Amino acid sequence: MAKHSKRSASIFRYPVLLAFSLFFVGLFALDLVTPDRAYSELENTTLSQRPSLSSFSADGLNKFFTASTKYVKDQVAGRDNWVALQSTVETKVMQKEQSGGILLGKEHMMFPRTYGLVSSETRTLPKNTAALESLCRRYPGLVNVMLVPAASAVYPENVPAGAPLLDEDRYLDALSEAVQTAGGRFVDVRQTLADHKGEYIYYRTDHHWTSTGAYYAYQQLCTALGLTPFDPSVHTARTAEGFYGTHYSKARTPDAEPDTITYYDLPNALTIYTVTAPGQPAEGETTGLYDTDKLSVYDKYAMFLHGNNGLSRIKGDGTGRGRILVIKDSYANCFVPYLTANYADIDVVDFRNYNYGLDQLIADNGYDQILVLYSFDSFKSDPYLYRAGAAG
């Protein structure tokens, strides 16, 4: 009995060790009763699931334990709070100017850390450039290309001093020359955005431009095509507060300044097609321009055009004529609604969910203009844009 008392007393001589032991035992117990999550809305990422014993026998010991380690990390109880705590320690205690691969700049702006083209981009960028050139040659005089610079290129003074930045100007200059040589029009929005940098043209916590930034670029396109721009003053602007974007999902800084999404209340119909073959599909589901249910979830930007559908068609407001085809990434989602003032039909293709070439679709619809609208960051890395260059 005396020995047992001495052993118990010796444990309490090390209160820190005891506290840590109890903490990890409690965390382990909490993990056992906490359901696994398939997706982290806050981080906008898929979470690892428990590896099966079949993967142990098929892939070997190392792969099984690697998968198990990632599973434990992704499914730890209170993961969102742990990520936030790590960010707080890094930025407030250690005074780091980056967190989760995101640079923390002035004016509460966040920027991705970019040293240069990664290995895959050195292969993808030339392929996508060649695809643009091919599209311009196949449809001379119809193709307009708009590649949007990153916020860091417009606001270099807000990026932390000495931070790595990709020289986008060098690549955009080369792309401009390539497009024009191939018979297309390069709509260079760099100066336009720089002229309006005192306004809210990029989100602070997200990688997209705002509806205001998109509008200034849209005005420049209208000037190039001889069109009368959409008039915001005759439409009702709606706002959604409390938007935290993709940069925040990675950085999770405690003092992040939330963004505001603005959109115009437009009645235009949008048809999302079921695409099973090249050309114009016959069947689709018709809805409105915006999925306003998304305004009550974390990824509010997904409300524009109901996300990144493979092929959709928007009806104009009745004042415009002709048809335009927009080949795009998500930067175009807040841009496209403005085109309702200029065209009777606006067809929108996103190659992430459209697995065919464009020639049959173009032949079926006889477009008056084609617009390729991407952020440069997406253009240099998109593994699907090569389809624009494929004949057929």
Functional labels for PLM-detected ranges:
Residues 1-392:
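Extracellular glycan-modifying ectodomains
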